[in-house]
Amino acid sequence: MEPGKKYFVHPSAYADEGAQIGDGTKIWHFCHISGKAKIGEGCTIGQNVFIADGAVVGNQSKVQNNVSVLEGEEMGDYVF
């Protein structure tokens, strides 16, 4: 967890060192967040999601269960 940040990562999920995760974001079961991924504030990352290096998830967005967000993909704010 980044110093001063307030977000939730389920114990079965893993966020690599260097991943940028915004305040209020929740990362659920069996997810893997790569070290160069960026996730905005207030997001929900569903179960079994993979977010690759270089992928961006905007603020207040939701990634549904079993989705992969691949390198270079960018989701804007408020995407569901």
List PLM regions with ranges.
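Extreme N-terminal tail/first-helix region
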Residues: E2-P11
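Left-handed beta-helix
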Residues: H10-P11, D16-E17, G22-D23, W28-H29, ...
